Design a protein with these regions (language model features):
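Active-site hotspot residues in diverse enzymes, especially metal/ion-binding acidic/histidine motifs
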Residues: 1-158
Length: 158
């Protein structure tokens, strides 16, 4: 029987700590370390209360409609900062037509390349990369400057 759109759900704090996550959509969350800085969940902190929408494409070609919004609660006292989190949800791009947040987006051309995390990502030209990938050897050349702070040689077969 048809049970509706399978979504994933994520809640994280400004430090990137994930406090809740569920996935019926097959989104492969990173188990350790931070997630990709190009993913919409991180930019949602910069626009409090505004729904941010992104078509995110993983290196393996998996593509997801993602939407995220920051939420805050009252502080427990005047001396405490307000707790802020981002709530993110998404679904496989095949279900985008069933989700209102895809309205007006050309999902076939709007994809932003993201990775699970910098250490697991094979995207060589990422300007947001914070760490080199674990599976590839660094290409150190003091005379060359690329898009990414970490140039690397692809490991054969990976």
């Amino acid at each position: 029987p048809d049970r509706g759109v399978p979504f994933f759900f994520l809640r994280l704090d400004p430090a990137g700590n994930v406090s809740k996550r569920f996935s019926a959509a097959g989104f492969p969350f990173a188990r350790y370390g931070g997630s990709c800085p190009r993913w919409v969940v991180h930019s949602a902190f910069a626009t409090p209360g505004v729904m941010r929408v992104q078509v995110a494409q993983l290196p393996d070609g998996g593509t997801f409609l993602c939407f995220a919004r920051s939420v805050s609660r009252m502080a427990s006292s005047w001396a405490e900062p307000k707790p802020v989190h981002v709530i993110a949800m998404g679904c496989d791009i095949a279900h985008a037509g069933e989700v209102v947040y895809a309205d007006g987006i050309d999902v076939t051309h709007a994809a932003v390349g993201i990775g699970l995390s910098c250490r697991l990502c094979d995207r060589a030209n990422c300007r947001s990369r914070a760490f080199p990938p674990l599976e590839h050897r660094l290409a150190l050349d003091p005379m060359t400057r690329g898009d990414s702070p970490y140039r690397f040689e692809r490991t054969p077969g990976r």
